[in-house]
Amino acid sequence: MKTPFLRVKNVVSVSALCAASLIYATSGYADDQRHDDENSDRPITVAVTGDWPYNKLLLDNAHLLVDSVNADTAVSRLIHVGDIHAGSMPCTSADILPPIPQSNPGYNQKIYYQFQQFAKPVIYTPGDNEWTDCQKTKQFKSGAPLNELASVRSQFFAKPGLTLGKETEVLSQSRHFDPTYPTDAQFVENVMWKQGKVVFATLNVPGSNNDTLPWAGTFANQTAQDKEVSERTGADLRWLEAAFKKAKKEHARAVVIGIQADMWDPAAITATSNELSNYTPIVQKLADLVEDFGGPVLLLNGDSHVYGADQPLTNSSSATGSIHHTQAVPNLTRITVQGSTTAPAEWLRLTIDPRKLQPFSWENVAYCADPAISCE
């Protein structure tokens, strides 16, 4: 009998990623170190995944990921950065009767069931494949974007302020929003929490150029799409500000942000088009907040399917630094998690040690040899 495929690789730290460029510490950040609480300075370990499950094989073998994460007693939570099925798989035809023939009405319930098998709190932020892109031909025109987003919210966020998996309290924007912007209350999926000296937040930032690629066919509705993008992006920016405000107020030593979109995906820029342009307001706001915070910040994303780690804003004239026209921000690190059917299928084991100047270290844990062929 073959043993389950499990291996650990790519043990990485920020200092290994870039030794000298991240030696920074503003006076405000240094002052925060005087507020250390011995009981809350312990290292924090979380699991991160995304673009999962991306095919029938991964769904049928979901227990491999669940069991691998559950077996790690150090892991305190799981963060899923969106896309619960492939971009070539159908959506649910939510609120459309009779259902679109090529749709899969019960799919989200299957994923919800798998999330509930984790013995850890599960924090999930939606990806474009489960709502934004449902109107595309490659997804069989199997759902209206806003209907699908509403369905995702009703399935995965039915209890605002509570995680999936092992129920644990988090702050949801639906309950903690600026009353000046009442439409922010709809974003139940944007959540925030603090563990020890680390503030975490998730934002609904999908692919498809932040949902600005035109909805097609019978689902075309430019007015509704523009309203969606405007309200969600505004809410995201305010939630991002709230996360850093919380981090400074509570003397956090690090901040971790989770989104779906790869806002620096080189494949999205060609000689004739720039499908990253509508992330610029988010990246510029992030750059300003990270610079002001002064401490280490980690951005987690999926979307482009292949593991990678970089510091995208360290050099404002570099390939990544020049895309969104920000100042140089050396204290931002970014990790793209392995996903889709990229072999091997892996989850990211992230450890944050607030006692260290460079607190982030991580390793990839493989649980399926080749998700396009076989997990054995």
Regions found by a protein language model. Give the residues of each.
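A short C-terminal boundary segment appended to hydrolase-like catalytic domains
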Residues: 347-376
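Active-site environment of divalent metal-dependent phosphoester hydrolases
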Residues: 55-56, 86-89, 126-135, 208-213, ...
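Bacterial N-terminal signal peptides that target proteins for export
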Residues: 2-15
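Extended active-site neighborhood of metal-dependent phosphoesterases/phosphodiesterases
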Residues: 95-232, 314-354
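N-terminal active-site segment of His-dependent metallophosphoesterases
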Residues: 31-104, 252
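Active-site neighborhood of phospho(di)ester-bond hydrolases with catalytic His/Asp-centered motifs
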Residues: 48-50, 77-83, 121-127, 258-259, ...
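N-terminal signal peptide c-region/cleavage motif recognized by signal peptidases
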Residues: 20, 25-27
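His/acidic metal-ligating clusters that form di-metal
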Residues: 39, 68-77, 194, 201, ...
